[in-house]
Design a protein with these regions (language model features):
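Preference for long, amphipathic alpha-helical scaffolds in soluble/luminal domains
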Residues: 1-302
Length: 302
């Protein structure tokens, strides 16, 4: 039996009742969630907790929050999985959780970890080495983004998630350092946009060729650029609407819908095409979060 106020949520979105029950039923004994089955991982656990919180569920989400709390690293970040001693970009997802539920001190340490993280190409050591080699920095390296793993280059996905976490914290408690990193991260995204709009996972050009955009990264970046009005964002929205009509990936459609919702550009009455199935627990959780966002409860920024 799923705890909390899930019946109220199910009346608002009839198709979600089974999804919520199924999601709760997939919880491991340790309190975490797997991607499909088996070992608990941080990413699916955070998405599951966010989805259950959006539905008003408290019992299983509470167990998930305790699992997350137990896996904090000494440096204030979170690993991809228990037993791994390196904090990763999944810390940004954890920082999206309400501090009053995660624990204010733990949440604050996660925010501090994000503020101290940047892609390797933005570090003083890297830039000095490039200068000594006579290599001029590329235009897409001017602003710092976030890497998947410390000590590596910045990518669009982790940068988008870090922006969301820091912007959410800045709305809660405005601070200059939060605002500065959010603004720099958004400039990073604009510089990394593909020539015809949208975003690839990383570089604008690779091996001498223009990079092509992907639907999931385009949706993530647009979500992180909520409130930004520019020609670049307008071009990206056009690409996102095209992707929405063409792609059949649950993950991609989840992020595209969230990205378009952030700019009030999701077509009225849009429904996911028949036959599109959630193949992982993060897919199912994100679909629930899209449904909640369409009803005014978006845990990515509220």
């Amino acid at each position: 039996m799923v705890g909390g106020n899930w019946e109220r949520y199910s009346r608002q979105r009839p198709m979600a009742i089974m999804s919520i029950e199924e999601l709760a039923g997939k919880q491991n004994q340790d309190g975490g969630w797997p991607y499909v089955r088996g070992t608990s991982w941080t990413e699916p656990t955070v998405y599951a907790v966010l989805a259950l919180l959006a539905a008003g569920e408290t019992e299983c989400s509470g167990r998930g929050l305790r699992w997350i709390g137990r896996n904090e690293q000494p440096d204030g970040g979170w690993p991809a999985q228990p037993g791994i001693d390196q904090s990763t970009s999944v810390t940004a997802l954890v920082a999206l959780l309400p501090p009053e539920l995660l624990g204010r001190e733990a949440h604050g340490r996660g925010i501090a970890w994000l503020l101290g993280m940047e892609g390797e190409e933005s570090t003083l050591t890297y830039r000095l080495r490039e200068w000594l080699l006579g290599n001029a920095p590329g235009a897409d390296q001017e602003f710092a983004g976030w890497p998947w793993v410390p000590g590596t280059g910045a990518w669009v996905g982790p940068t988008s998630l870090a922006i969301l976490a820091l912007e959410k914290e800045n709305r809660r408690t405005p601070r200059a350092d939060l605002r500065r990193r959010v603004e720099e991260g958004r400039k990073f995204l604009i510089r990394r946009m593909c020539q015809d709009g949208g975003w690839n996972h990383g570089a604008v050009r690779a091996l001498g060729y223009e990079s092509q955009p992907y639907p999931e990264t385009t949706g993530q970046a647009l979500l992180a650029l909520r409130g930004v009005r520019s020609a670049e964002v307008g071009k990206a929205l056009t690409v996102a609407r095209r992707f929405l009509a063409e792609c059949r990936s649950a993950d991609a459609l989840n992020w595209l819908r969230l990205g378009l919702l952030a700019h009030d550009e999701l077509p009225a009455g849009y429904c996911v095409p028949a036959g599109v199935a959630s193949r992982t627990l993060p897919d199912a959780s994100l679909d629930m979060l899209v449904g909640a966002a369409q009803k005014g409860s978006n845990l990515f920024w509220v």
